[in-house]
From Swiss-Prot:
Recorded domain comment: The N-terminal domain interacts with RNAP and the C-terminal domain binds either to Rho or to RpsJ (NusE). Contains an additional, species-specific domain inserted into the N-terminal domain. The N-terminal and C-terminal domains can interact and form a closed conformation.
Record protein name field: Transcription termination/antitermination protein NusG
Pfam families in the cross-refs: KOW, NusG, NusG_add
PROSITE patterns assigned: NUSG
One BP annotation, GO: DNA-templated transcription termination
Organism phylogeny: Bacteria, Thermotogati, Thermotogota, Thermotogae, Thermotogales
HAMAP family: NusG (MF_00948)
The organism of origin for this protein: Thermotoga maritima (strain ATCC 43589 / DSM 3109 / JCM 10099 / NBRC 100826 / MSB8)
Amino acid sequence: MKKKWYIVLTMSGYEEKVKENIEKKVEATGIKNLVGRIVIPEEVVLDATSPSERLILSPKAKLHVNNGKDVNKGDLIAEEPPIYARRSGVIVDVKNVRKIVVETIDRKYTKTYYIPESAGIEPGLRVGTKVKQGLPLSKNEEYICELDGKIVEIERMKKVVVQTPDGEQDVYYIPLDVFDRDRIKKGKEVKQGEMLAEARKFFAKVSGRVEVVDYSTRKEIRIYKTKRRKLFPGYVFVEMIMNDEAYNFVRSVPYVMGFVSSGGQPVPVKDREMRPILRLAGLEEYEEKKKPVKVELGFKVGDMVKIISGPFEDFAGVIKEIDPERQELKVNVTIFGRETPVVLHVSEVEKIE
């Protein structure tokens, strides 16, 4: 006889304990022929409304992560290319500077300032500080903010000036963590193409989900902390052959309150409803369609949509929330008689006219 899936009811918060208790009891009694796999459906959700980590990179930076992928703390996520001398010459100046990047509120434009440490940085300037046009950035007021926005990056760097034989000057800004004082010295001659600084590597400071944004003047990597959330609190899905022995076996497990039943009889879960549960648990494969770079949002709250890819493929639901920036929709789908919110990319749904 083929096993079917049933829903075991428990108190919310005791799902893992019930799963553990059933597995231990199956192992101890050896009735694997009656009780099989056990699944607690979970989804990964963002744990915060703002990025846990934000990295601003040059357009030439090489990315080692993709949009929507999960990373662990310490993973290599990006690297800036090495810095090479554009022309031959002599290093005539090496100074400490502070790099300050100001971004407009709409995130469309940025302005970068390199302020000599000798000029003094205005007190109170830090990442996240809102600034207005005309605000002094240095104590000597030689460096003035030219746009309204907020500071998104502050970093100590070295300004290296190389004077060419014809009297012109090439300026390089080298981050302190790749600055080599043996390589960069005042009075040292450098050849065209000579490496002034090695590639700068960036490692994830936190674990989470990656969002990559590609602007014309820069690249950004944002890492959002994530957490796992029970999709159906109080439900544990058990694959079993339903007979008196199996019923009493599961029913006697601590914290089990019963089965989802009709007329006093446990009701097996329909294959169509079980399919997304198995996909989320990694027990059934499905084709994950690639998301386009940009999709025009043609949806509004209240629209009825059909899910066309992912674990909930072929289910229909109603749009409850729209996130235009991430091109994501929160859709309520009805499964097992419950309305369950799922977050989907706009490319994973189509509107039902």
